[in-house]
């Protein structure tokens, strides 16, 4: 009786002999994800430029809120080998982060800000976060969304600090996501096969 590896190799043989790429299930358009993530990085930096000493302050309770913030970690499969083996877990983690930050941009922390007017950097950032998260959502698969933290600062200065903190955290998240998509676009994009 053949073991699983032999069966898989036999199943892949027709594609290998014809020079075809092995079909991937629910694989995103890596090049489009790369372009959108680059755009998001640029928008995140234009939405939050460092403002003197404010960015150097360490907000009280910062360590407590770090556990709520989505991070791409080693076990998420976003490393080159993890992406090659099965990119879905990594893409799910990135999508969860994008949705998390989109909800934060929708929150009262950012409401009433002149920077949220249509076509402002934060508004464009919000729209692009939504676009990339939808691109990562396979049509036939619905991922769970995590519980969103409740942030309701009562004072204007608290909102300003939280906005700064959220945008800095978003910049770091997007930088890592952009690296993942750049690697995916360079190595995981299926080659076009000429039709005869």
Swiss-Prot record:
Subcellular location: Secreted
Alphabetical GO biological process terms: cell surface receptor signaling pathway via JAK-STAT; cell surface receptor signaling pathway via STAT; defense response to Gram-negative bacterium; defense response to virus; inflammatory response; innate immune response; negative regulation of interleukin-10 production; positive regulation of activated T cell proliferation
Keyword Signal: yes
An MF annotation (GO) of this entry: cytokine activity
Signal peptide: 1-21
Highest taxon, organism lineage: Eukaryota
Record-level GO cellular component terms: extracellular space; interleukin-23 complex
InterPro entries documented for this protein: 4_helix_cytokine-like_core, IL-23_alpha
Keyword list, A-Z: Antiviral defense, Cytokine, Disulfide bond, Immunity, Inflammatory response, Innate immunity, Secreted, Signal, Tissue remodeling
Main location: secreted
Subunit structure: Heterodimer with IL12B; disulfide-linked. The heterodimer is known as interleukin IL-23. Interacts with IL23R; this interaction enables recruitment of IL12RB1.
Function per UniProt: Associates with IL12B to form the pro-inflammatory cytokine IL-23 that plays different roles in innate and adaptive immunity. Released by antigen-presenting cells such as dendritic cells or macrophages, binds to a heterodimeric receptor complex composed of IL12RB1 and IL23R to activate JAK2 and TYK2 which then phosphorylate the receptor to form a docking site leading to the phosphorylation of STAT3 and STAT4. This process leads to activation of several pathways including p38 MAPK or NF-kappa-B and promotes the production of pro-inflammatory cytokines such as interleukin-17A/IL17A.
Family indicated by similarity: Belongs to the IL-6 superfamily.
Record-given protein name: Interleukin-23 subunit alpha
Species, as recorded: Rattus norvegicus
Gene this chain is encoded by: Il23a
């Amino acid at each position: 009786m053949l073991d699983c590896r032999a069966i898989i190799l036999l199943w892949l043989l027709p594609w290998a002999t014809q020079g075809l790429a092995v079909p991937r299930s629910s694989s995103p358009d890596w090049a489009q994800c790369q372009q959108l993530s680059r755009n998001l990085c640029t928008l995140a930096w234009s939405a939050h430029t460092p403002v003197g000493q404010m960015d150097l302050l360490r907000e009280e309770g910062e360590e407590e809120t770090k556990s709520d913030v989505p991070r791409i970690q080693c076990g998420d499969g976003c490393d080159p080998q993890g992406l090659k083996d099965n990119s879905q877990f990594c893409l799910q983690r990135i999508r969860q982060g994008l949705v998390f930050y989109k909800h934060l941009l929708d929150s009262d922390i950012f409401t009433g800000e002149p920077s949220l007017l249509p076509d402002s950097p934060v508004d464009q950032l919000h729209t692009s976060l939504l676009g990339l998260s939808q691109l990562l959502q396979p049509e036939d698969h619905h991922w769970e969304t995590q519980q969103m933290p409740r942030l309701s600062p009562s004072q204007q200065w608290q909102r300003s600090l939280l906005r700064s903190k959220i945008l800095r955290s978003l910049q770091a998240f997007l930088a890592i996501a952009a690296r993942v998509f750049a690697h995916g676009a360079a190595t995981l994009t299926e080659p076009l096969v000429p039709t005869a």
